[in-house]
Amino acid sequence: MEKLYNNIAYEPDASPSDAQNVPYLKHPPKIIDISVGRQLFVDDFLIDSTDLTPEYHKPKKFEGNPILFPETPWETDGAPATCPKSGGVWYDEEEKIYKMWYEGTWLKNMCYATSKDGIHWERPDLGIVKGTNLILPYENYTELEYHMPKVEYLRPDSTTVFIDYSAPKDEKYKLYLHNPGGCFPAVIAVSGDGIHFHDFALAGDMNTGDRSTMFYNPFRKKWVYSVRAFWSGRCRSYRESDEYLALAAQGSECERRWMACDDLDKANPYIGFPPQLYNVDCVGYESIMLGMFQIMYGPENNVCETGGVPKITELMPMYSRDGFHFSRPCRKSFLNASIHEGAWDRGYVQSVGGICIIHGDELWIYYSAFGGYEQSRSSVDTERDVLQRCNRTCQASPRRLCFDER
């Protein structure tokens, strides 16, 4: 049993996280340590009694969306895309600049962009491929060069980039990349500048689903794989390690079932597809782990390809005091798909690595969405990405932000 920073007694077990039965909410510690971070009333952990009803608000989408869209040849060579899926959008506290890692052209290129204000983005010439902002040109990565069997290229299907300020300078940036095409080990690496990566390794024997990601739990100092699994439709399994690169050595015995949709997640009445958990991204925020629960409302890929429309996924925030058990007290979509024909955010709304950035009294939440292309009926052209930002103003003092008002 592990005693956490807030006095929660955390004991890993084989049971998945149940959002309706969170152990520390049912049996909170008698004394709660509130010395770490600002305390947020996102659940009932800090409340002994009340006659108030929580109200959960939605963010206001930025009127200037989308803030990044396919323009360059390497973003339009195939199905056009500028999509951090999950990628990463961060404000680098040391360099005082916004940074973004995203997918340029659907399932093809890994790109890097910067911004002075988090809204207007530039594509710097990085010199890796002359005149471009490409950072991992997949044709340069061969089985011989990196000694990675069955991995002859690096193409982003699902990625995460995390900034680690506590690491040695040449390991400040952590990369997770899953190639498209099925269930097989992902690729991990580290970097000193977020551009030139090294120490590439396969993530052990982890035959993960294509939409797997990773994150860091700063309260327990654990690196976590958020693994796409299929034990309850699309769902999630969990692995953790003290050292990031050590995750590569883990076997499947280290994996635990983590979370899935439940009976409170209702189908979209116009689609009728049983909801499934598509992806999970998480980040440490103040005194909690903040997560984005991406629900898939359908339909399946073959139906979308036939109609030239994106599948419908939407985002729902979730909260944890131990990093494993998450509550979802509000089951309404936080960032929803527009769904209607012609909308550039018609569907496939997805969170980013890092989830949000503090900006004064606001949280700026970055996400990506797809418009579809009904004129096309091929699987290559069905999904056209745009990156968008929305921000949300909370009625609170700077940085004292929460997601419900009591």
Report each predicted region and the residues it spans.
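Long, C-terminal catalytic modules of enzymes
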Residues: V352, E362-I365
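Beta-rich carbohydrate-recognition and catalytic domains
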Residues: M1-Y278, V283-R346, G360, Y367-R406
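Beta-strand/loop-rich accessory regions of lumenal/periplasmic or secreted enzymes
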Residues: C330-K332, V352-I355
